[in-house]
Amino acid sequence: VKWPNDLVLGGRKLGGILVEGRMQHALLQRLVVGVGINLVAPPVDVPHAVSWSEWETPPTADRVRRALVDRLVLGLRTVLELPSPDLWGFVSQRYTKILWGLGAPQELSGRTSPEKKHTVLLVGPTEDGRMRVLRDGVPDVLHQGEWVWSYP
């Protein structure tokens, strides 16, 4: 996973994850999870995209869908059984293990100033889902949507 939600294969974007939740009185009321995977062809408007078929014969969309739902249900059952104080530690530890590019230099630009490039070193996620980095050698915290990430 490339922060915050890209699925990466061979250093290129294979798909993405979108999670939206609704809280009420500090409790999660609703959660919607969307996953998109380029099985056969990458989108033409994403130059750094890749499709599963470029690596091997992809499974059918139904098979992928069933596997994703099975894993998601298993993961949600595990997480929902945890006491609230332990939840972030559990999720963050697993997210950090699969985070692409952690500890390696990454190039990004501001969404409002794409011509200005920065080199960051990914340090790890914060408790609220932002990313701790060293940006041009200075500690910083990045917010989702403010930055555009380069691909190699």
Model-derived regions, located:
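General beta-strand structural signal in soluble alpha/beta enzymes
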Residues: 1-3
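Long, positively charged amphipathic alpha-helical accessory segments at protein N-termini or as interdomain linkers
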Residues: 9-152
